[in-house]
UniProtKB/Swiss-Prot annotation:
Compartments where located: Cytoplasm
Residues the entry annotates as binding GTP: G24, G25, G26, C27, N28, G111, T112, G113, E142, R145, D189
Function field: Essential cell division protein that forms a contractile ring structure (Z ring) at the future cell division site. The regulation of the ring assembly controls the timing and the location of cell division. One of the functions of the FtsZ ring is to recruit other cell division proteins to the septum to produce a new cell wall between the dividing cells. Binds GTP and shows GTPase activity.
GO cellular component terms attached to this protein's record: cell division site; cytoplasm
Keyword Ligase annotated: no
Protein name: Cell division protein FtsZ
Protein family (similarity comment): Belongs to the FtsZ family.
Keyword annotations from UniProtKB, A to Z: Cell cycle, Cell division, Cytoplasm, GTP-binding, Nucleotide-binding, Septation
PANTHER family to which the protein is assigned, alphabetical: CELL DIVISION PROTEIN FTSZ-RELATED, MITOCHONDRIAL DIVISION PROTEIN FSZA
Gene this chain is encoded by: ftsZ
UniProt organism field: Neisseria gonorrhoeae
Length: 392
């Protein structure tokens, strides 16, 4: 099912959200968002390729490095892309000034996007703008582009508040071997679009039930590192669980996991008067099962008159994540071990489901995971079991 995203303007001091697409991939993503009616967001495109930029549909377009590149592109050289952005720092600053939140979108691995993205992010942060990058990573068979992309990502991480990475390798896994190149890249553009539209909807659509505002988004996304955004839609019996599972298990975001999330935003949308408290509890319980014990969680509930009474849409934004393969450098640590005989009792506290359980602590080493007596006495958290098994 396709959605037309209508990010309604708030009546009182609406947050100003801008999206800047950099290079060929970023500019294509901007065109896709414009074509899909993502509204109440200001679009900016910036490129060193004058011919490509002239065909872009963004209201604001910036020719980067006119003197340096003569409008002929960066030649897949990120140093050229970086220098081109530095040449036009003033134009970039003027274009993004006044934003409360800036999305940077690009395809990493090329010249313009990889080189200019850290520069744009640094300018945005100097202006006090909440800065989120949503980028793609090249296919693993692309050789040099992979290394260029990784170096660019490391630089980008230093300046953005949150970073959402979409690995192109996952396109083949998610869409099948028979997918065409056009379909694959359209899918990547759609993930970029959904991330921007979903977060923007949370920020700018007021709710009369439980409202999420820009301050909530800033709390969860500021200085958080790796992030993910997912959305799910379901109808009928068990709709809350199905939509939540969809939202947290996007195959195109498979390089990160919700396990250990430090910040989460959850937005639940139904037809007027159709959200049950039991569904709210179920959604938050699923989220909290995978997240960090010190999770900063905010949730909102909104109503959409265009939705059917048996439908639910759930948007989840999780931050402070680790990429798969990242491990805690400390070999031995203290974790909560939960006695399974205690009865769990859940309640809502400050917009978040918290679980009260009888607990005690113990130090676990790697060997304890193979000791059946330890496993029998304690319920080892799933995140630790999975991490241990993957390290074998």
């Amino acid at each position: 099912m396709e959605f037309v995203y209508d990010v309604a303007e708030s009546a009182v001091s609406p947050a100003v959200i801008k999206v800047i697409g950099l290079g060929g991939g970023g500019c294509n993503a901007i065109n896709n968002m414009v074509a899909n009616n993502v509204r109440s967001v200001e679009f900016i495109s910036a490129n060193t390729d004058a011919q490509s930029l002239a065909k872009n549909h963004a209201a604001k377009r910036i020719q980067l490095g006119t003197n340096l590149t003569r409008g002929l592109g960066a030649g897949a050289n990120p140093d050229i892309g970086r220098a081109a952005a530095q040449e036009d720092r003033e134009a970039i600053e003027e274009a993004i000034r006044g934003a409360n939140m800036l999305f940077i979108t690009t395809g990493m691995g090329g010249g313009t996007g990889t080189g200019s993205a850290p520069v744009v992010a640094e300018i945005a942060k100097s202006l006090g703008i909440l800065t989120v990058a949503v980028v793609t990573r090249p296919f693993s068979y692309e050789g040099k582009r992979v290394h260029v992309a990784q170096a660019g990502l490391e630089q980008l991480k230093e300046h953005v508040d949150s970073l959402i990475i979409i690995p192109n390798d996952k396109l083949m896994t998610a869409l099948g071997e028979d997918v065409t190149m056009r379909e694959a890249f359209r899918a990547a553009d759609n993930v970029l679009r959904d991330a921007v539209a979903g977060i923007s909807e949370v920020v700018t659509c007021p709710s009369e039930i439980i409202n999420l505002d820009f301050a909530d988004v800033k709390t969860v996304m500021s200085n958080r590192g790796i992030a993910m955004m997912g959305s799910g839609y379901a109808q009928g019996i068990d709709r809350a669980r199905m939509a939540t599972d969809q939202a947290i298990s996007s195959p195109l975001l498979d390089d990160v996991t919700l396990d250990g999330a430090r910040g989460v935003l959850v937005n639940i949308t139904t037809a007027p008067g159709c959200l049950k408290m039991s569904e709210l509890s179920e959604v938050m319980k699923i989220v909290n099962q995978s997240a960090h014990p010190d999770l900063e969680c905010k949730f909102g509930a909104a109503e959409d008159e265009t939705m059917s009474e048996d439908a639910i849409r759930i948007t989840i934004i999780a931050t402070g994540l680790k990429e798969k393969g990242a491990v805690d450098p400390t070999p031995e640590r203290e974790v909560e071990a939960v006695a399974p005989s205690k009865q769990e009792q859940s309640h809502i506290v400050e917009g978040m489901i918290r679980t009260n359980r009888g607990i005690r602590t113990m130090n676990l080493t790697a060997a304890d995971f193979d000791n059946q007596s330890v496993l029998d006495d304690f319920e080892i958290p799933a995140i630790l079991r999975r991490q241990h098994n993957s390290d074998k």
